[in-house]
Amino acid sequence: QPTVGIPELRKAMADWYKRWYHVELDPATEIQPLIGSKEGILHVTLALVNPGDQVLVPNPGYPTYTSLNKILGSEIVNYNLREDNHWQPDFDELEKMDLSRVKIMWTNYPNMPTGANATMELYEKLVNFARRHNIVIVNDNPYSFILNKKPLSILNVPGAKECCIEFNSMSKSHNMPGWRVGMLATNAQFVQWILKIKSNIDSGTFRPMQLAAAQAYNNSVEWHEEANVNVYSRRRQLAEEIMKVLGCSFDRNQVGMFLWGRIPESYNDVEELTEKVLHEARVFITPGFIFGSNGKRYI
């Protein structure tokens, strides 16, 4: 059926995961091409979560995790990401929660909006946490190539495929926004459950775009170095200059396509700063509160 994606694309995705992440995937059973990874958020939720079930969502985090689960009737349970913990989950805090109704935990590393990078230690902790509590970790991993020379995958943890799903997106890794080509990788059973949902929603991606995407997965190391490191480094320098002009503090080790900064104490709140910039310079800067309450002093 067309929804599963053409064999050439699935093989290219599997080869790409092996080449860059050192993860072995069966292209026939452990990969599902997506019309952009964003639709995967819908498919995974419909496949694994029933109305009234709970889902763990990061604060701050990508707003779609919250809005879509609310639409589908899931109960949102926020878990904190804080600067003093390097924007990583506080597992001691998580262990104190009642997790009996939690079905999935959304994670996103490298992180949007904070720019926190992934580590294998973090991924190992997440996999162990998932196993202890019978929770599925859904790691949204589109930014691992942006300003990052060592991309990581949660699926590199032994046994992770049993309890983890990972998204990837060519919009970010290959600078192909608008093509709407993404993927998820996990165990064969999860793929089948997700495919049952997806096959009732769409009919797959235009074949020539799949063939072109398969070719793009062969891009060289040099291509990625220029497009995803060098070009973004020049843009990052400009963004850092803006942060300095505004008096914001930020971590220069951030990766991904965003720059996250803490506003000066001289402002009452982030809205005061963003409104000032909007009206005086006619530039919109995203206020951090849209990502959650832990972002209320950030842009």
Regions from the PLM with identified roles:
Residues 1, 12-15, 19:
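Glycine-rich loop-to-alpha-helix module at the N-terminal edge of alpha/beta enzyme cores
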Residues 4, 18-299:
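PLP-dependent class I/II
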Residues 5-11:
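Long amphipathic alpha-helix in the N-terminal Rossmann-like dinucleotide-binding domain
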